[in-house]
A protein has these predicted regions:
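Caspase-like cysteine protease fold
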Residues: 336-401
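Structural motif corresponding to the intra-repeat A-B loop/turn of tetratricopeptide repeats
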Residues: 396-397, 429, 466, 499, ...
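Structured catalytic cores of large enzymes
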Residues: 53-223, 227-230, 352-366, 370
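C-terminal soluble interaction/assembly domains
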Residues: 274-347
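Structural register within alpha-helical repeat arrays
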Residues: 389-390, 422, 459, 496
Length: 505
């Protein structure tokens, strides 16, 4: 742990902050971020770039890539030598993280005419030369003119700090960007505060029930995330239906969200007043989820940030599923204490491609969670912390014994989130009677209306799946009589409508 902590303290020295001098807010945000992360003033880099999100390859070369290469050499962040073939090679690398600030261009449009030094290949991948600015910058140190296709990522599936990777001069590029400057400032503050106080809350994972056409891998990622969270004592609500979470679904205390597959932000996120837990990580798989970051309702990346997420990932153009961020790897590395930037790049198979990561590159939401002072952290974190501690201490128990002990412990302490999670684990395994019992306990322990309604919805689902629709109907009606009307209660009305016997015509 000592070496890990020393490495963490050295992260600012490995980081540069790049802003657009043509955008006044960009420099102010760069200085704000550098101040929060103790990044030296001489690690701030201003470039005079176009104002548009989408730029040409020529504009990228002239205003971003070539000026940055010169600055890297001038400031001795790179030591470059000329190889036998006459090409430049980066010999040593002092900078590993790059934070692009709001105002920097987002993506490079396709080149229709021949580009000197490029050799396009055949097929849907090697023939394409558009890319995100961020992913292109990650291979800046390769000094290559090859822009078609992808560069295989040597860090993919890695499990060590990027400073230990010597296979290639890799830059881990993320951006602090959002529809508004105030949102970017909030993302910066939330990340720093979550590291101090802990990222506590539940995960919501939205599968798509895809079983063919190569898309089943996305659902495999989602199922793996559920298992990863359970091992760490992070409660999970998992929806494996083809549709996304319903509009009014009570998504309270959302610290992690992973889902797919809708074009624009939808579901509970569009409910008035929805907010993530400060510091939340959220990602939704879609081909154009980050086609723009300037519209709080277009795609997913910008809208998720606008609704309170501190970090997200997305794509600026069609990437193909296997070449998007593998969300199961992303989540696993975050849970193991890596930075957001390291986690994203370890989850990405391809570079010089379509992906972007939006958030503080140095953000480590789970690095300190075993060292956070329980007396200093908010009282509201006690239940989440207790579940995490239980999961770690009892990780050697088999599933049945683990859930039995978890339910006993949670029942004694009235840990509602833990009881609900045990119930959902039992339901996934088809153990409906014990699932219903645990969910009923959780419902009794919760005090907030939306949490109670969510448990009722889950109980009704368990009754229906166990062949007892009348029990589900009775429960929905009983709760509707005593719970005040809310958007979430509309889902109970739907259960009532669906299950009420229709009179014969």
């Amino acid at each position: 742990m000592g070496n890990d902590r020393a490495a963490a303290e050295n992260l600012p020295a490995q980081t540069i902050v790049v802003f657009n001098t043509a955008v006044p807010d960009s420099e102010a945000l760069a200085k704000f971020y550098a101040g929060k992360r103790a990044i030296a003033d001489d690690h701030l880099v201003g470039l005079d770039c176009p104002l548009q999100e989408e730029i040409s390859r020529e504009e990228y070369d002239a205003t971003i890539a070539e000026p940055l290469r010169k600055i890297f050499e001038q400031r001795q962040w790179w030591h470059v030598h000329e190889a036998d073939d006459g090409e430049k090679r980066v010999q040593t690398l002092g900078i590993h993280f790059v934070a692009l600030i709001r105002g920097m261009p987002l993506k490079i449009r396709p080149v229709a005419t021949p580009y000197q030094g490029d050799t396009p290949g055949g097929g849907p991948i090697q023939s394409r030369n558009e890319a995100s600015v961020d992913s292109e910058l990650s291979v800046l140190g390769l000094f290559t003119r090859q822009i078609s296709g992808v560069v295989p990522n040597p860090y993919f599936q890695g499990f060590r700090p990027v400073a230990e990777v010597t296979a290639a001069p890799l830059l881990l590029v993320t951006r602090l960007d959002a529809p508004g400057s105030a949102t970017v400032r909030r993302m910066i503050v939330d990340a720093v505060e979550a590291e101090k106080n802990g990222l506590w809350g539940r995960a919501f994972v939205d599968g798509s029930h895809e079983t063919s056409g190569g898309k089943e891998v996305g659902d495999a990622w989602m199922r793996a995330i559920v298992d990863q969270c359970h091992k760490e004592g992070v409660p999970v609500v998992f929806d494996d239906l083809p549709t996304i979470f319903p509009d009014a679904f009570p998504m309270s205390d959302c610290a992690l969200y992973y889902g797919w597959y809708a074009g624009n932000i939808a579901g509970p996120f569009n409910q008035p007043g929805f907010k993530f837990v400060p510091g939340a990580i959220a990602a939704h798989i879609h081909s154009y989820s980050a086609a723009t970051l300037r519209d709080e309702n277009s795609g997913w990346a910008g809208p998720l940030a606008s609704r309170g997420a501190a970090a997200t990932v997305g794509n600026v153009y069609e990437p193909y599923l296997e070449l998007t961020a593998h969300l199961d790897i992303l989540n696993d590395r975050l849970l193991h204490g890596f930075t957001f930037a390291e986690s994203v790049f370890m989850s990405s198979r391809a570079l010089s491609w379509m992906g972007v990561a939006v958030g503080d590159p140095l953000y480590r939401p789970y690095f300190n969670w075993t060292q956070i002072d329980s007396k200093a952290s908010p009282k509201s974190a006690a239940g989440w912390r207790a579940y995490h501690d239980f999961a770690i201490k009892n990780s050697d128990l088999g599933p049945s014994d683990y859930r039995t002990q978890a339910r006993i412990t949670a029942g004694r302490t009235r840990n509602a989130a833990m009881l609900e999670d045990v119930g959902l684990m039992e339901m996934r395994d088809g153990k409906f009677s014990t699932a219903i019992a645990a969910l009923e306990q959780a419902r009794g322990a919760y005090s907030k209306r939306d949490d109670i309604i969510r448990c009722v919805l889950e109980e009704c689902d368990a009754f229906i799946k166990s062949g007892k629709p009348n029990r589900a109907l009775d429960l929905a009606r009983r709760v509707l009589r005593i719970v005040p009307e809310s958007p979430a209660s509309n889902l109970l009305h739907k259960i009532e409508s669906d299950l009420t016997p229709k009179s014969a015509p």
